[in-house]
């Protein structure tokens, strides 16, 4: 989990390519829930909330970059101490971002143990929600491909998958069957084998993502032009605030991966301004996707791609496009699931080491004792015994929990909008807002008191006033309260 990699040796790319990676990271499958949220909450409230949420997300992203520069200065000073390098003095150059320091490692550098554990737990719960969304979206898409196409608000999970099928095979039964198939047959072997995304899969998913979103915007626009608006969402509906806010946070989530994308950039000139431009482009993209969908379809599905699979166009070309859009979440999320699962396992192991450090030390002592007692064993016997000793309860329990809990949530509900709103509203708020605020506050203090040098203007977030941290914290707190009130059924 903790790895600082020199960008000069791990591969670099131009700033333009890096910004494109940031764009691709932000525009993920969370965008598929936005059109439904727009239609539920109203177009004016949605535009206002999404704009404000995007701005707050951008402020938090600049905090992560500033903390990253301080982390690089800390590592630079550590290297000078280790190698007794007195030639290079402390200065602005030590804050240059040349080493990749993950958010988890920055938390270990700057935060207290309580804040560190909070950060890890927030990331863990967020990743749990992420996996639950994945293991809901893929099976629901597969179920809609297999079952009769219904594009209406009257469809129920208890409806039969096909009229000619046995009554027991309802849409929910088929969905749950696909949940088990997806997790046990497809994803579990990849997680056990430790398969991660290759370059070719990354290129394929990026191209399919761009093609899918462009097709959805184009088809919805064409439908509006030819048939007019099928729905007339209100300007605002505060009862839809909860789902909208959660989806807005989820749709702009990128902070946990910023170090991996920013560090390899060959030049980081005006990086804050250019990332602001990326956020602006993403915002326009989201508005176009969501507004066209909210008005073009009478009933927007919680997985937006399903609206096109269920439309009235039956020509050969449209059928190919519809099946591609229906398969799009299956392709992209299946390739990402093992990465999220392995990241979650790593975070669990780190928290275990933080909370129970003595367990590892005791195991080491036992291994040393065993080696003294059984020095006469053969190499094969010693190797087999060590492998058995190294396998603890956690090694079996953690992967089981990682897959079992999100799968259980997916078996309970197929409401992807609900899962996205809860994941974005609670753990998502911590990952996107709370952790960056904690990091930048501690990093600035560390730069002044330990490094004895302020963060250079080039690496400074444009939002230096403590008021911004208070504002983000207040916004996050207010929003979580609103979401909670909506979830318990309070009317506004």
Swiss-Prot record:
Signal peptide: none annotated. The keyword DNA repair does not apply. It is found in: Membrane. Residues 39-44, 135-176, 231-237, 296-324, 414-415, 488-492 are extracellular. Residues 1-17, 66-113, 198-209, 259-274, 346-392, 437-466 are cytoplasmic. Glycans are attached at residues 151, 313. This is Transmembrane protein 104 homolog. Keywords: Glycoprotein, Membrane, Transmembrane, Transmembrane helix. The chain crosses the membrane at residues 18-38, 45-65, 114-134, 177-197, 210-230, 238-258, 275-295, 325-345, 393-413, 416-436, 467-487. Belongs to the TMEM104 family. It is a multi-pass membrane protein. It comes from Caenorhabditis elegans.
